[in-house]
Amino acid sequence: MTFERKDVSKLGSDWSDTLVWYAKAVGKLQERPLASRTSWRFLAAMHGFNEVLWSAHGYYSSGEALPSDSDRARFWDQCQHQSWYFLPWHRGYLASFEAIVRSAVVELGGPADWALPYWNYFDPDSRSVPPAFLQKTMPDGSPNHLFVEARYGDGHGIFIIEPEDVSLNALKDHAFIGGDSGGNSGFGGPDTKFNHGRGVNGHLESDPHNTVHGLVGGLEDERHPDDRTTYGLMSIPATAALDPIFWLHHANIDRLWEVWRKRDPQNLDPTDPSWLMGPADRKFIVPDPDGEGITFTATQMLDTKAAPLNYTYQDTSDPLAGSTRKKVRLTGLRLLSDAPMVNFLENKSAGGQVATELLGANASTIKLAGGVSHTRVTLDAASADKVNNSFESVRLLSTTPKEPDRVFLNLENIRGKNDAAVFYVYVNVPNGDDPKDHPENKVGVLSLFGVSDASKTDSAHGGAGITQVFEITSIVDNLQLDESQLSDTLQVQFVARNTVKPEHDITVERVSVFRESL
């Protein structure tokens, strides 16, 4: 049987049968002991486990029986982030969860075709966390297991994803695989081994994935930045999957992968055997409804209609009506030339490492706090001229122009204590102007989901933090259209979206700019 995952906002009512049965099944899974592979907490710990945080939130009691050392080593702390495995691992994880919940639904007398719904926060009518997740009781007055106390949003009971918070820009990127040398980080992320640690965010993981985590989870009390127990479950990877909304959020991320795959024939998944059959250093494993361990690879995650997945989505239509990064750029640069830019639209398959060059960087580590923070990036004149000169084939009316250089802003080795922090990032806002008055200068949204773990010096990456890449090619293109050029400096501004205090110690070790020559 093939199951259909439906849009939660189109199920007919706030308390549709799908959500009623989901709530009941969550309650059943929560009754199972932690050591049970099909329990709510075991499944959540596969994404991440932190004894201190779980205890503080009431999900673990000191002395409680844990799974065997073997089960913990194989099943727990598996989630893949800052990696090309981000999408296939989470797909297998969701499929396992969905099958276990469906089994519980059937045991409770529910429908055999129950499927996990998705939360499409890009729908203007569905930007808030669904009402069923915000009520303490179900319609019959019984406890609502979809509700959690540790979900804080903006701190005042507001759980809205505003239009400016997230974008679908990731869908415009043809390259699945990104690099880690300053250029495009890719739709799906950089080539890594098993990566439960930190590194460079892929495009879809950065936006909307990370941002939704931070804005939904939020922070209860900003006065105690060292107390991670004051952060919402969704804000921290080690607690995120304890919140029932996590699964609807990730169903939407998984759906967007399908949208990306279908919207353009140039959008290709990797064909590298190390992705298809990897990772070699640790196998992915999930439990089935009987608790048996099932290993999987990315190869098995490519056809959702086939076993072991067996599902479709209610809507995988293209929300951007065919718009791609190259087409958008072509439309703008046609103002420089009337030439038919045929070669400009050629694609080079699934992506990967492309030659990059450092254009420049700021002078020192900067600290981010509330309000507006800023820094200046000094560019090497000769390197900036290479970017400017890359537009010559367009200006000279070539019939086969080469695409000009792409330019990327890198926020390197971000460290801090506030996993829920979100910033809007702008480049070259006119002096004295409010950045919010210049949406054309906004280059993206920075979310620090996972930053506290990545900042620990005893972590797998030695406290290197996380790195975020934003494409700022449009800024450079606009300079050319204004008959100007990339000069010796760029001004970068960070505008806090939510509560950020100096005590959160958020720093960016280096802000750099790279060019990618195609």
Segments from the language model and where they lie:
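C-terminal accessory segments of proteins
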Residues: 1-518
